[in-house]
Regions:
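Short, glycine/charged-rich "phosphate-handling" switch motifs in NTP-dependent
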Residues: 160
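Active-site-adjacent loop and "lid" segments of alpha/beta metabolic enzymes
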Residues: 117-120, 141
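Conserved N-terminal beta1-alpha1 strand-loop-helix module at the mouth
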Residues: 1-69, 79-88, 93-103, 136-139, ...
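A short acidic, helix-capping loop that chelates divalent metal ions and anchors anionic groups
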Residues: 111-117
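Charged helix-capping and loop-helix junction motifs
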Residues: 40-45, 120-128
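Non-cysteine beta-strand/loop elements that form the S-adenosyl-L-methionine
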Residues: 103-111
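Conserved residues at the C-terminal ends of beta-strands
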Residues: 30, 73, 108, 165
Length: 202
């Protein structure tokens, strides 16, 4: 999940907490308009939420704000900083070919994005799959992903995961939205566990 406090229906820390409870395990902290001190404080608030669920907070930009994970834009910096986890935004085969020591890439936009109107043209799953086959690192699909069906199509195209912004940030219930989007990743065992939990609640 990527953050955008301007689209969130409530406080960002609350949204992230609910999303993590719903199954999100990676959060990319954007909020690049904040002063560094405020952004670092926000990162410090979010890290324990992710850590408690075995998740990871990734900071957008080369400065990990005291952490060990960063997500870089397509244009730089090169070489990537030496951190525990480094990802990069990519949009075409040329950008994927420039990857060196990155651990993963996002490829976008897969679908038209309400968060970035006019951003595109959208790749759609077929072209996404072609780029994934060219990528030297695992790929997360990004852009306009709002339904479980879209998630499933990205996974079937070869994505190891999806990066979602608006579908969770704008949701009345971020936890419920996150859980719905996670359904395509569930195994038969996790479906059984969830059903058993629901039965006990009933």
């Amino acid at each position: 999940m990527l953050t955008d406090r301007w689209q969130a229906r409530r406080g960002l820390v609350d949204v992230v907490g609910a999303a993590v409870a719903g199954g999100v395990r990676w959060v990319v902290l954007r909020e690049k308009d904040l002063p560094r001190a405020e952004r670092a404080a926000l990162a410090a608030d979010l890290r324990p939420i992710l850590a408690g669920a075995g998740g990871t907070l990734v900071v957008a930009g080369p400065d990990p704000l005291g952490g060990d994970a960063a997500h870089l834009p397509a244009a730089g910096p090169y070489p990537p900083p030496r951190l525990g986890l480094v990802g990069r935004s990519c949009h075409d085969a040329a950008e994927l070919a420039r990857l060196t020591t990155e651990d993963y890439a996002t490829v976008s936009p897969v679908y038209p994005s309400r968060s970035k109107p006019g951003y595109g043209p959208p790749l759609r799953p077929a072209r996404l799959g072609g780029l994934i086959r060219l990528s030297p690192v695992p790929v997360l699909a990004l852009g306009g992903i709002e339904t479980p069906g879209q998630v499933r199509a990205c996974v079937e195209a070869g994505a190891v995961g999806v990066a979602v912004l608006g579908a969770i940030m704008r949701a009345d219930d971020p936890g419920e939205a996150a859980a719905a989007l996670a359904i395509p990743f569930e195994t038969p065992q996790t479906r059984h566990d969830h059903a058993a939990t629901a039965g006990r609640r009933g």
